[in-house]
Each structure stands twice: as C-alpha cells, then as structure tokens.
Amino acid sequence: MNLFSNAINLAPAAGNAQPIRPVKDGYFITSPLDSTAPFPAVNKPLLISTVAHEAGFAVHGAFPDPLPEAAFQPICNATFGSSRAPVVVSSPNYAPVSLPDGSVDARTQLQVVGTDYLWRCSSWTFARNWVQNGGAAYVGQYLVGASYPGNNAVSFCTGAGIVCHQDDIEIVVCIFLQ
C-alpha cells in the first residue's frame, strides 16, 4: 500500500490513487504505452472508445453533494501534485461552469478533468501511436449509451444526456456478439 500511496512522487506520469497502472515489464508489456519511445510495428485493427462522461460515476459517487469552486484546486493538487495542478487549474478546458442558478459546482470541472486524464487522452495517444506504426484504429466517443447496471447508484449517471463509464459496454459487446 505504501507504493500505491507514493506513486505520484515516484513517477511523473502517475496520478494519485490510480488503481491500475500498466508498466513496461519486458515480458508482457515490452514497449511503453505512451509517446516516450518508438512504438513497435503493428498491423491489427483496434476499436478504442470512450464515453462522454467517463469520470462521472467516480466524481459524483465520491462527492454526492455539490462542491464549491474553492474545492477544485485542492482536489487537483491531491490528484496531480502541487507542481502539476496549476497547469490543469489554469487551463481554459477546465474553466468553471455556471449552473442555471448562477452557482458553480466543481464536480462539473472534475468530471471533465477525470475523463480527459484517465480515459480520453490516454486512449487517443495510444490510438495515434498505433496508427503511426502501421495499425488501424477506430476511435469513437459515445454521446448516447445504454445505462450499465450499477451506474444507477449515482444519480448523475441517470440524468438526461449523461453517458457514464461502462455505458458503452452492452452496445459494443452486442455488436460483436451478433
């Protein structure tokens, strides 16, 4: 558990509390999965998809009540470390969004940050590397999903127009089973 807790201090790419972190072990994973080294030649096609609100379940599950805007930076500090958080916090991609009543709920920003950080950026980087090295990648983002069992435990995930993590599974699996 000590390694898990200190991962953010050991590797610049590691975030705080990431449960799964694939590593180049020379046996199962023989080359980096990011852009830090030349990618091996490939020829298999891949389907890589994400959903619009990947981090919605995690963020709204951890914080069921609205968060004040003042909570955004400390949560980013805890996730990315104090040296990297300012880049995220100052990005126009994660600017505060006013709700209809004029208030700001930091969960909105955190959901976008989480979706980008853990799903979208890593998927797109991997797809780009795959294609640049001979493979084909079909990349998509689901804007409509099929609510995955269990996602109803977080009210955000049951909202109109919301597609949370795993809401693509039954669609993708059914396509391949037919």
Model-predicted segments: where are they?
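Substrate-access "cap/lid" subdomains that shape
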Residues: M1-L67, A71, Q109-Q132
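Generic low-polarity alpha-helical segments
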Residues: M1-N2, N77, I169, Q178
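Alpha-helix boundary/capping residues
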Residues: I8, T79, P92-Y94, F176
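Alpha/beta-hydrolase fold catalytic core
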Residues: P19, G81-N133, A137-V144
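Active-site rim elements
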Residues: L33-D34, D101-Y117, S155-G159, F176-Q178
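N-terminal leader/propeptide and maturation segments of large enzyme subunits in energy/redox metabolism
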Residues: F63-A85, V89-P92
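Mobile gating loops/cap/lid regions near enzyme active sites that modulate substrate access
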Residues: C121-W124, R128-Q178
